[in-house]
Amino acid sequence: MIVPIRCWTCGRPLGHLWEPFRNRVLAGEDPGKVLDDLHVTRYCCRRTLLAHVELINQVLPYGLIEK
């Protein structure tokens, strides 16, 4: 839902790489090539960025609780 700040497995900081990765992939570049250019070489880190799905906009309306 929210972009992971660190890799779940090794703990490497990844939050700063999400926007460049997403923008380049949406522009039509190959995700593997983008990760190589961003120097993301570990399988665990690549998996964290590749498998992330942004659902925050769909979940936000359900988080409001009125009293």
From Swiss-Prot:
Gene designation per UniProt: rpo10
Signal peptide from the UniProt entry: none
Listed GO MF terms: DNA binding; DNA-directed RNA polymerase activity; zinc ion binding
UniProt function note: DNA-dependent RNA polymerase (RNAP) catalyzes the transcription of DNA into RNA using the four ribonucleoside triphosphates as substrates.
PANTHER family per UniProt: DNA-DIRECTED RNA POLYMERASES I, II, AND III SUBUNIT RPABC5, DNA-DIRECTED RNA POLYMERASES I, II, AND III SUBUNIT RPABC5 FAMILY MEMBER
Name the record gives this protein: DNA-directed RNA polymerase subunit Rpo10
Family that this chain belongs to: Belongs to the archaeal Rpo10/eukaryotic RPB10 RNA polymerase subunit family.
Catalytic activity: RNA(n) + a ribonucleoside 5'-triphosphate = RNA(n+1) + diphosphate
